[in-house]
Swiss-Prot record:
Its main location: membrane. This is Potassium-transporting ATPase potassium-binding subunit. Part of the high-affinity ATP-driven potassium transport (or Kdp) system, which catalyzes the hydrolysis of ATP coupled with the electrogenic transport of potassium into the cytoplasm. This subunit binds the periplasmic potassium ions and delivers the ions to the membrane domain of KdpB through an intramembrane tunnel. Keywords: Cell inner membrane, Cell membrane, Ion transport, Membrane, Potassium, Potassium transport, Transmembrane, Transmembrane helix, Transport. It comes from the Bacteria.
Length: 569
């Protein structure tokens, strides 16, 4: 731990905050139907696509129609991607001659990319053809991100409108998210990545001669284009098995900075756009502040834990100045490895430049806990915002109980119907995480996949289901997850974490949109003050995190105590 490391982290966060307002204003303009600098180019294309699809942009949908359209679209995307993965041996652009994926692996992978999880039970450079990567996985990187943005927009309109029966048009929101936001930013970022040395080619591989004269075959492919949307869409699935630790995905410290900035840009700007669209920028900044408090605390915790190192190694006389460098790339160092670890799990990206299974017990506890909080720091593109709004609803309800008034948020009364749906959404994650983890912890077939015994083995299981249900996608890689049990149950967990959460959220949006927007009075609890920020942070920790404490005590916490006693697993 050094002042230079803290300076790197501080500079990174400062750059992120500089992008929030301009990008947030642009997003608000796009989805409020205002003219932007891209409108002359993309406006005619948008109208053409909607006309071909038979979509009337002026015809809006109620919450149920919006929800059914979202579910139908994602079901079609799942079937299309499943078919591509199963049939890739017969499809073009397969220079490696890869066979089709097995049914359970194709099921897992298709759900993974449709739900924006990008959990990968396969090695990309050894299992997925160029066609599967480009026409299958990369396409879903765009569509899953656009789906999250669309749901977030529907929730935003619920607070912006008064006595309304509609939330917008799902097809229009999807089209605009892709055309005006994801595609332009991805094109620019992909070109930047190519300039930085990330390959973009249809060649299968290149043969290199090592220093000792041996021949080595290095996989290639359309990497830069996939890397761009992987980060901007908070997808996280890598072209290579090593993900952003691979030099062809993340060749330098500068590219590492761009990767982190890209993964944070849209999801943070959406919170600002929320404030702009509901007519209260103070609310947007309050939500950003609550996210920043927890995310910065997570970064600091990982950095401190990893630079402290392993006391068993220190007792053997190893140099303490390096800390725990196992599983880390020296071109990034401790500070940026810690920042990437906390941010990728707080954001629901799931890409890694550090192997999370090699973190110290407390260092590994932090990313696990950040996912369990609900992926709202600031979470995935779109999904983080609507997840954060659920916790805002819970927070004002608790505040209302304390002062004896009907809770309100942004002029909308929060009543029994909204609370029921909010609690239903909040209970989805612990049900999927703890339920499947408990079964896997006693099932012989599941236990056979463990790479480590003791508390770390339990942590591997817990992290896998946490990552799947939280739609994150990162892993403790000691778990061999490419089995029928894990492919199936993790796939179910991913679907629950995405759709069983989104449906109650859209139901809340429909209920709130129909209500008349009231004006604030002297007795209204203000939701843009430091008091609200503190209460929101407390509710997130209590309701989002403490329900997992018994499981964490048996996993990473027990492993940490054992490490202090001289035991490793």
């Amino acid at each position: 731990m050094s002042s230079n490391g803290w300076l790197q982290i501080g500079l990174l966060l400062a750059l992120v905050f500089l992008t929030i307002k301009p990008l947030g204003l642009y997003i608000a303009c796009v989805f409020e139907g205002q003219r932007t600098f891209l409108s002359p180019i993309l406006g005619p294309l948008e109208r053409l696509l909607l006309r071909i699809s038979g979509v009337d942009a002026r015809r809006e949908q109620g919450w149920l129609a919006y929800t059914l359209a979202m579910l139908a679209f994602n079901a079609a995307g799942f079937l299309a991607l499943y078919g591509i993965l199963r049939l890739q041996a017969y499809l073009p652009y397969n220079p490696q001659g890869f066979a089709g994926m097995t049914p359970d692996l194709a099921f897992n992978t298709a759900i993974s990319f449709v739900t924006n999880t990008n959990w990968q039970a396969y090695s990309g450079e050894q299992s997925a053809s160029h066609f599967s990567q480009m026409a299958g996985l990369a396409v879903q990187n765009f569509l899953s991100a656009a789906t999250g943005i669309a749901i977030a927009l529907a929730v935003t309109r619920a607070f912006a409108r008064s006595a309304a029966n509609t939330l917008g048009n799902f097809w229009v929101d999807m089209t605009r998210s892709t055309l005006y936001l994801l595609l332009p930013m991805s094109i620019v970022l992909a070109l930047v990545f190519v300039w930085m040395g990330i390959p973009q080619t249809l060649d299968a591989s290149v043969t290199a001669t090592t220093l000792d004269g041996a021949q080595q075959t290095i996989a290639l492919g359309p990497i830069a284009s996939q890397e761009a949307i992987k980060q901007l869409g908070t997808n996280g699935g890598g072209f290579f098995n090593a993900n952003a630790a691979h030099p062809f995905e993340n060749p330098s410290a500068i590219s590492d900075y761009f990767n982190i900035l890209a993964m944070m840009s849209i999801t943070m700007a959406l919170i600002y756009a929320f404030g702009k669209m509901v007519g209260d920028l103070r609310q947007g900044w309050a939500l950003i502040a609550s996210v920043a408090v927890l995310l910065i605390a997570g970064i600091a915790a990982v950095y401190i834990a990893e630079t402290a190192g392993n006391p068993i190694h220190l007792a053997l006389g190893l140099d303490p100045s390096f800390g725990n460098m196992e599983g880390k790339e020296v071109r990034f160092g401790q500070a940026m490895s810690a920042a990437y670890t906390a941010i990728t799990t707080g954001i629901s990206n799931g890409g890694v430049n550090t192997m999370h299974g090699s973190l110290t017990p407390l260092g590994g506890l932090v990313p696990l806990f950040l996912i369990q909080l609900g992926e709202i720091l600031p979470g995935g593109v779109g999904s983080g915002l609507y997840g954060l709004i659920v916790f805002c609803v819970l927070t004002v309800f608790v505040a209302g109980l304390m002062v004896g008034r009907t809770p309100e948020f942004l002029g909308k009364k929060i009543e029994a119907r909204e609370m029921k749906f909010a609690m239903l959404a909040v209970l989805v994650l612990p049900f999927a995480i703890l339920g499947f983890s408990a079964i896997a912890a006693v099932l012989p077939n599941a236990l056979a996949s463990l790479g480590n015994a003791g508390p770390h083995g339990l942590s591997e299981i817990l992290y896998a289901y946490t990552s799947a249900a939280g739609n994150n996608g990162s892993a403790f890689a000691g778990l061999s997850a490419n089995t029928a049990w894990y492919n199936t149950t993790l796939g179910i967990s991913m679907a629950l974490g995405r759709f069983a959460y989104a449906v109650p959220v859209l139901a809340i949006a429909g209920s709130l949109a129909a209500k008349t927007k009231g004006t604030a009075s002297a007795g209204t609890f203000p939701t843009h003050t430091p008091l609200f920020v503190g209460l929101l942070v407390a509710i997130i920790i209590i309701l989002g995190g403490l329900q997992y404490f018994p499981a964490l005590a048996l996993g990473p916490i027990a492993e940490h105590v054992g490490m202090l006693a001289g035991t490793l697993y």
